[in-house]
Amino acid sequence: MRNAIPRECEVVITVPETEVEDVLAFVGECEQVWRDEFATIEEGLSFKAERVELPKYMVPEEIRDNLVDAIYACPNGVERFIPTIPDTVETSSNLAIVEIANGKAAVKVLTRSSRESMKDYRNTAIESCFSMAGMHVERSGSYSGWEPNVNSPILHAMKESYKAQFGELPEVKVIHAGLECGIIGAVVPGLDMISFGPTLQCPHTPEERCHIPSVSKFYDFLTATLENTPEK
């Protein structure tokens, strides 16, 4: 899943027999350094190193170095926040998957942005990293951004509908996520849209799931909104 933030990694490395114990000790030192760096953020962080059988094939040194350099140089994380909404991410990328198998290496990155020009800028920077490493780069699965409109008529109408139904105004947020509204808006420019739904738990992880008790509230809100929407 390119959408999931990486949380685990496994790699086989080869070293001279005389250096094995030093490498095992170094891994332990790295674990402690990372535990200190990510204290209170990643409580369960752990490293494990063990002897395994010598692999049948190894990545040639030049290709290995180019690949590692490209991964290090590849932009990852937040690129920019929305200028008018400083606490909300506008553009980012996720270096999600690195695979080496059957004589080939593949790196998968997901870029998202509410602004198309910034998404293209980030994609070009990523493409440059791997092109310079001699890798073939493809772009696929792109979807359009959706810029927030605080003056949206449907937003105003649904805020009032929510207040009438539940006795309080809803908490309206701009989120950094790929939404269907971006795809629809690219096909029907100028369409007034809003995105809402039941609560999602553990987003951007393999455990992402819907909070079932929130579905009934979402359904009631949706039907009430439709009932109060005037016909055109």
Question: Where on the chain are the PLM-derived regions?
Answer:
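Short glycine/threonine-rich loop-to-helix capping motif typified by GTGT followed
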Residues: 4-10, 58, 147-160, 183-187
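Generic non-transmembrane alpha-helical segments
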Residues: 22, 26-37, 125-133, 153, ...
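Substrate-recognition/cap regions that form aromatic- and gly/pro-loop-enriched pockets
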Residues: 90-177
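Zn-dependent metallopeptidase/amidohydrolase metal-coordination segment
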Residues: 90-103, 166-225
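Midchain, well-structured core segments that form catalytic/ion-binding scaffolds
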Residues: 1-112
